[in-house]
Amino acid sequence: MKLHYVAVLTLAILMFLTWLPESLSCNKALCASDVSKCLIQELCQCRPGEGNCSCCKECMLCLGALWDECCDCVGMCNPRNYSDTPPTSKSTVEELHEPIPSLFRALTEGDTQLNWNIVSFPVAEELSHHENLVSFLETVNQPHHQNVSVPSNNVHAPYSSDKEHMCTVVYFDDCMSIHQCKISCESMGASKYRWFHNACCECIGPECIDYGSKTVKCMNCMF
């Protein structure tokens, strides 16, 4: 009976998220999994807008770092108009502390039949772009998000203007969670990763000075 109840509730949650209008809804790609978990555990059932905030603290703890992005999915805060700031215009970035440059280069040389897209462009082009995405740096020692500012003397890839360096990045074809994105990029030896809030994952190679490309290019995860 309990399994049946959980299945019905999960289906109802997914239908609810699908029904929400695109321009006025929560970030489905980012929030669906965690929202479902919190609702199944009945931690977000109260309605602050109606004066009942008895579950607010438990719901916030359940959503954790996703509270700011996902509180509107569970009716805890006012809905936002995402037509002005689509998920593709935001991303989370992180440096990977044990990159394997030789592995990354080997996996990205030549044509591959794997489910990813390899893109290379001059480092000078990478550095010339202004950071027009809202990016956050997540590290083990810095649990709170902070705006990214990357020094030009990044230890992963020293840059010299007298030689043309190429920045190589890999986009996975399919959408994935931020956790899976980090694991996938670590497994191919990347130096950093960028996870767009539409769930597109970009692994960044050792020659890149900044955080790769700010453009979504995941074949099956563009919106």
From Swiss-Prot:
Glycans are attached at residues 52, 81. It is found in: Secreted. The keyword Glycoprotein applies. The keyword Ribosomal protein does not apply. Interacts with CHRD and BMP4. This interaction enhances CHRD/BMP4 complex formation. Interacts with BMP7. May be involved in dorsoventral axis formation. Seems to antagonize BMP signaling by forming ternary complexes with CHRD and BMPs, thereby preventing BMPs from binding to their receptors. In addition to the anti-BMP function, also has pro-BMP activity, partly mediated by cleavage and degradation of CHRD, which releases BMPs from ternary complexes. May be an important modulator of BMP-regulated cartilage development and chondrocyte differentiation. May play a role in thymocyte development. This is Twisted gastrulation protein homolog 1. It comes from Homo sapiens. The gene is TWSG1.
